[in-house]
Each structure stands twice: as C-alpha cells, then as structure tokens.
Amino acid sequence: YYCIENRLKDAKGFGEKSQKDILEKAQHYLSSKGKWLYGRLEPILKDLEVALNSSEITRFQLTGQAYRKSQIVDEVIYIVDAEEWPVYIEGFELNDQDDDSMIGVYKEELLVTFLLSVEDLSKEAFIQSFSEDVAIETLFDISKLPFGKDNDRAIFEALNLPYIIPELRWNQDLFHLKGEELIKEEDIRGVVHCHTTYSDGIHTVKEMCNYAQDKGYEYIVITDHSQSAFYASGLIIERVVQQHIEIDKVQKDFTNLKIFKSIESDILNDGSLDYPEDVLKSFDLVIGSIHSVLNMDIERATTRLVKAIENPHMHILGHMTGRLLLSRKGYPVDYDKIFDACAANNVSIELNANPQRLDMDHTMIAKAVAKGIKISINPDAHSM
C-alpha cells in the first residue's frame, strides 16, 4: 500500500529505487499465489489420483497445464465420467458444484476443477491437453475426432498422426519431434553439478559417488560453491586442495565411475571468476554462476556474463538469469549477445533442472542449439 501510494520513499533508509524494488517483489509474490511448481505438484497429483480411484468416479483424465507438465501450473483440471458427483473423495473439500463441474481443495492447499464429460472423456481431455497458443484446427478436424478411445495415444493413431508427447503440446513448432529423438532417463550417462558437505550439500563426496554408481552412471562431476559464497560454506583455496586430495583417494574405490573435480565459481560483480588462474586451472570443469548483486539492468547483467564467458577457464554458464520460479524474477539478459559469446568461446549453457530454477528457460533452448551451443542439463544436486 505504501509503495503504491508513493509514501515508502520518504521513510528513513528508503528512496525511489528501493521503493520500486519492493513494489515489484510484492507484486511478483502476489501474482504467484495459487500457482504451483510442477515438481512440487506431481507427488500431490499421485496421491489425489489414488483417492479418485477409491471414489464413485468411474474414469478420469488429467488435462491442461498439469498434464503437459508445465514448469508453472496455475490450474489443475480433470475430465471425469461419473453417474453423479461423488459424496466423498478422501482429502478433498468441496467449494462449489453444479451439474457440469465440481471445484474444491485437496489436502487443504491444491485447488482442483473436475469437469463432467459431456460427450467423450478421452476426446475432451485430448483437446484441452493442447496449449491455447496451439491452433489445433490446423492439425486435425475437431469434428472428426474419434469416440470411445482409451487414451490420447489411441486418438493420434486413429487420426494417422505421429504421437506428440504432452510436454511438447505448448508449442506447435516442436511437433515435428518424434519420441525417439527426445531424451529419456536411460540416456543419462552421468551427472554434472553435484554439491557435497564441503559446501551446502547434505552428503559426502563418497556418498554421492556411491549413489551415482548405484544408478549405473559412468561419471559424476563434484561441484561445490566457491569462496565468495560464504553463506553456502564456499571453498577457500585450502579447502579446494583438501577436496581434490579426497577425490583422488575416493576415485581408487570406483573403477567404473569417473569422478571429475569441478567448482561452481561465483561470477563476481565485475564479471571475473572467484579464484586466481592457478586455482581455476586445477579443476576439470568450471561452472560460472551469479549468486549476488542480482538487481541489474540488461546492459550490466549482459556485460557481466559476457566477461565471465570469455574467461578461458569457464566451461558452463550456470542458471543464466538467476530466477527462482514463483519467488524471484530473473535479471534481464540480452540472449543474442550471451549466445554469441558462448558460441565464440565454446562455453555450454546450463539448463538447471532444480524445479525452482529451470534456468535457462526452455523457450530459449532451440535458439541456443541453432547457434551450435551445447546445453548441459544439470540437477544442481544438494543430496542423493
């Protein structure tokens, strides 16, 4: 209220800039209410579907954003078949109900909408599985969609169309991709960007390596925080040396797993990396990331990142915009300049797979790949 009324700037210790920053953060927080990270939503949906299977609902199909596994979901929709609306669904509290829909809250936190199937459940869920940005009428004649199919894969087959996985149904330009061209879990050969107890991870180097070996991986890249990240117990130079000695020792216990020595080096305010050259040279791989002084305009952020990318010891640009989905907007960057710098310096870009980051944004990946840039899909793991 005080920001909107332009009053906070007059309070001691505040000014125009801080008032604007606080207002933007408050507006971002308010606009995020009721929205979910898919990574947090998924286990709740599994529990809900167990409850639905125990109710009077005979068939149900998740559709919309949640079915597409969108990184942010602001509505959860099920198409259902039922003789009548169930009196009880375990964990579900009814808010509103009419002949066609039922809305309520599951486990006191998740707003769910159930839509009663009017004509054919699979057909209706199929149509709603596409983003509003997709012109589905250019793909098939809606009036000729088949009835009585068990699932959307069967509908694609009946239309004599290649199957489009739900995750791609947000962008018509991606529909040419076939299932065999997409990354599957069994394609994962190793993991990059793994923190340990040396910084802010939960498990030791050896515990992380044991887990990687049990998963059948060929390599693991141990990547703790650098010295400027004091809040995350970042490694001073002596600790770097200590960790490298330990990795060499642990490596002797793993004949089928290669352990790489890495660091998530802070990109400092002037764009330099967080160690002198002789220390940077000791790593097999350097990921450079910004963790501090995030309030930047596009010119300052881009200049800072490009300088880091041009450092000869930099291998991967980590979580490029610094965003935390539903919590913090990322700083703006000039993607063209960043991509050109990465291509010129053979620096890969991280797709940070932490559900709260997913940074860089998936919408920019095709453009980066077109410039010959490799994408490193990393867990940013802090535990096994």
Question: What spans do the regions from the language model cover?
Answer:
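Divalent metal-coordination and catalytic microenvironments
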Residues: 15, 64, 142, 193, ...
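An N-terminally biased module of ancient metal coordination in phosphate/nucleic-acid-related enzymes
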Residues: 173-267, 316, 323-341, 358, ...
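Distinct, well-ordered alpha-helical segments
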Residues: 269-279, 305-306, 328-332, 360-370
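Acidic, metal-coordinating catalytic segment for phosphate/diphosphate chemistry
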Residues: 94-185
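Active-site nucleotide-donor binding segment shared across nucleotidyl transfer reactions
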Residues: 46-87
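Non-catalytic positions within long, well-ordered alpha-helices that form the structural scaffold/packing
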Residues: 53, 209, 213-214, 309-310, ...
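Helical scaffold of the NTase/Pol beta-like nucleotidyltransferase catalytic core
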Residues: 1-2, 7-61
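Short amphipathic alpha-helices in soluble, non-transmembrane regions
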Residues: 86-95
